[in-house]
Amino acid sequence: RTCYKTPSVKPETCPHGENICYTETWCDAWCSQRGKREELGCAATCPKVKAGVGIKCCSTDNCDPFPVKNPR
């Protein structure tokens, strides 16, 4: 499997056994100025949802592109 990974945001081969791509988004102290933080990567299972964190998982190559920002 290949997934986009941060910080490079380039497709990379996932380690053996990690067949899920994920996009995790959350707000930090700069959220109102910069927007949500994003983390992209590979996992063996979809990460557990935590309060205030959005998670999207998928299982095809490069299915987790960096979220598109709305122009201001």
UniProtKB/Swiss-Prot annotation:
It comes from the Eukaryota. Belongs to the three-finger toxin family. Long-chain subfamily. Type II alpha-neurotoxin sub-subfamily. The keyword Disulfide bond applies. InterPro entries: Snake_3FTx, Snake_toxin-like_sf, Snake_toxin_con_site, Toxin_cobra-type. GO terms for molecular function: acetylcholine receptor inhibitor activity; ion channel regulator activity; toxin activity. Keywords: Acetylcholine receptor inhibiting toxin, Disulfide bond, Ion channel impairing toxin, Neurotoxin, Postsynaptic neurotoxin, Secreted, Toxin. Neurotoxin 4.7.3 differs from 4.9.3 only in that Trp-26 has undergone partial photooxidation. Disulfide bonds join C3-C21, C14-C42, C27-C31, C46-C57, C58-C63. One of its GO terms (cellular component) is extracellular region. Expressed by the venom gland. The keyword Disulfide bond applies. It is found in: Secreted. This is Alpha-elapitoxin-Dv2b. Binds with high affinity to muscular (alpha-1/CHRNA1) and neuronal (alpha-7/CHRNA7) nicotinic acetylcholine receptor (nAChR) and inhibits acetylcholine from binding to the receptor, thereby impairing neuromuscular and neuronal transmission. Pfam families: Toxin_cobra-type.
